[in-house]
């Protein structure tokens, strides 16, 4: 059990590291081939924070462990808001200024509702996967359009912050070096995560869904946590919140879409009856906090969000032995 725990932690750290290096390499390649920096920032870099979830979901799907993938998608969205936004608010109260974010928030809520329509029947079908991946393409086109508009106007706070985060150094040799390293590490790391998560789920008599919701989702959300904390400390509030919005959309359309496309079939009914409702509720709370014009969320909100995370985690593990055979 201790060995499986250690290997799971090492695997998650390697997944996060390899995803970061892949994004770094992709940013250099895009810059080299003349893609505007703002589009790189709003697509490659933003999506990069969700790459660990995507990698784990893909590996779990290939091993027909769809509940682990579904749990990772839902759990990451819950954790991004309750834990990561809560901790960021505790570090420093902040306000969302960007009009781009306010245009993306309704899309995040819409996609969250779509997730319910996919999960409610306890089945993931290949048509569900195709539909979700089609939404992913539409979303990418949407943010590219937003990037081009922001580039012309040049006044949006989010776009200024994203440009500041782009890598400034490195040529093609550096990009290909990190690309190769990332592609070598990724399959090994994801296999470590999936295999040892299964071992621990069996040892503690909890479902793969619960393991995905908690341990895997927390581990794969480390990039969002690092981005949010660093963002609010530097006063880059919009990029901290923007990464959460982008990650939550991406988790539904890609991380949930992959198991539906690769390994369609039955899923744990608790994914809809227990976990989806929590995800939708915290998504609505998140949107309301961002739409407010007064300084928000403050430390009081941070305490409530992190407290909500602890309560959710405790109830999840308390109920799991009763609800899971």
Curated annotation (Swiss-Prot):
The keyword Membrane applies. It holds the Pfam family Na_Ca_ex. Residues 27-37, 89-104, 148-169, 220-243, 291-302 are cytoplasmic. Keywords: Cell inner membrane, Cell membrane, Membrane, Transmembrane, Transmembrane helix. GO terms for biological process: calcium ion transmembrane transport; intracellular calcium ion homeostasis. GO terms for molecular function: calcium channel activity; calcium, potassium:sodium antiporter activity. InterPro entries: K/Na/Ca-exchanger, NaCa_Exmemb, NCX_ion-bd_dom_sf. It is found in: Cell inner membrane. The chain crosses the membrane at residues 6-26, 38-58, 68-88, 105-125, 127-147, 170-190, 199-219, 244-264, 270-290, 303-323. Disulfide bonds: none annotated. It comes from Escherichia coli (strain K12). It is a multi-pass membrane protein. Belongs to the Ca(2+):cation antiporter (CaCA) (TC 2.A.19) family. Gene3D superfamilies: NCX, central ion-binding region. This is Inner membrane protein YrbG. Residues 1-5, 59-67, 126, 191-198, 265-269, 324-325 are periplasmic. GO terms for cellular component: plasma membrane. Its main location: membrane.
